[in-house]
């Protein structure tokens, strides 16, 4: 069946459609209330060509399209959910994908518990009487730490289970409900104080400033510096505004600014009339994106995660076609009326103005991506690699085998997205296969990047491409390796040159699955130095985790040799303290509380002998 005949035979039902180019590469994913009507709207049929009323970006996409697939679903809402999920997983060439994939932390309290404790979450927590505060773009941990220092609440669920007062009670930072020293009713008064403090960021900052001043006066500079960092973390979430929202309303605000081929989405969160947090996403597009599609994508991506919805109004800077329908979708998802509105009052217009000013600042501060653009041209990449994931493995004679992934995005290493893995593979090839496969399996939760950079040669490049193709994602891949001297790859500068392996579609090689080419660049070449920097960071991170893993393993083996410390006691220690480092730091009394005096003494002697 020809392409045009396939389009004419589409069903008049809701679903998603996928366009592919002549090589079978995915170009675009869209949703439709009626597949037949929506897809036909892209074309003219006499002769068969793209419709005249398309935007430049969509016109270019349709000009490249040579085939399509579709999936029928029960409703338009189902189509929306499936479309959003597939776009994030597969990264089609012409879809808009926001760079900011993170979820935001909330502080929550489960008021159904007899002795509730504030905790941090990034998703909905099961429970009928959960109270959420946030979101926080930064400072959530700093706020929580301050609350626990000021108000004597339960600080660990394990304390309640133990039935014995812990160290926090001894220093006056817990009321010891585990020993019945406070009733649930009395305890709830302190919970109310904590809730008041969470709402009052100015009061928290006042408390912290007083503490910092006191530490400085007592020449306790390390403690003062820690408090200073906490203050900065809390303050950095603020966008200062002179807007006074007398109604003390809650709003989630989205605003978009487009400049040339760049677009910025700003999110601002207002709680009880105060701006409490903000974030932004940068969209780098090959062609100018449409503002309506950006709003739809930004709102969908933010609320597609299991994020608590603590507001009931979303304020947007511009009207767009799918606004009312999107309100219905979110209302169904969260089980309450959610309105997506444009500003009508002076105060709300001022908030949108504030958001757009911040968006322009983000655009102004964006660095030129010269090296990234040059890499795209040099290796004929599908997309400019704004986000790059770099992989390496590390082991010592097959022991403590680990893998590492580091991430480069928006002109810097994004350490919050770094990941390390314990690997089972016996050789470097199988280790890399395991590492890349495990990363690919998480594309649904953590969308793929523009480029994978692998530490290795042809075999690793072939392997990476095989795994990428199995997912259907649009990701470019490069491999970097040292030439071998005396059968060994030398990382030290001057001993050997780095080779870059890439897929060259113009190269015709019958004996291989892929047309793999290699390139040696001058040591002074900025493009090579950039790739080396990425590879070296992945190597550093892998080595660091390998050493830590080996130390931990060695410590565990040695500690088990201590008389009287078996696996059961080891498990008990780890469950209580959380890590070997914490066991090592624990005091004699803390160890004695978990085990007994004899074991505590043996463990302290063991760690003393390690120094």
From Swiss-Prot:
GO biological-process terms attached to the record: nucleotide-excision repair; SOS response
Q: Does the keyword DNA repair apply?
A: yes
UniProt-listed Pfam families = GIY-YIG, HHH_5, UVR, UvrC_RNaseH, UvrC_RNaseH_dom
Q: Where is the GIY-YIG domain?
A: 12-96
- What residues does the UVR domain cover? 202-237
Which keywords, in A-to-Z order, does the entry hold? Cytoplasm, DNA damage, DNA excision, DNA repair, Excision nuclease, SOS response
Question: Where is this protein found?
Answer: Cytoplasm
Q: Name one GO cellular component term.
A: excinuclease repair complex
Q: Name one GO molecular function term.
A: DNA binding
**According to its UniProt record, where is this protein mainly located?**
cytoplasm
Which superkingdom? Bacteria
HAMAP family for the chain: UvrC (MF_00203)
Job description of the protein: The UvrABC repair system catalyzes the recognition and processing of DNA lesions. UvrC both incises the 5' and 3' sides of the lesion. The N-terminal half is responsible for the 3' incision and the C-terminal half is responsible for the 5' incision.
Annotated family: Belongs to the UvrC family.
- Subunit structure, as described in the record: Interacts with UvrB in an incision complex.
Q: What is this protein called?
A: UvrABC system protein C
Record organism:
Nautilia profundicola (strain ATCC BAA-1463 / DSM 18972 / AmH)
The beginning of the lineage is: Bacteria, Pseudomonadati, Campylobacterota, Epsilonproteobacteria, Nautiliales
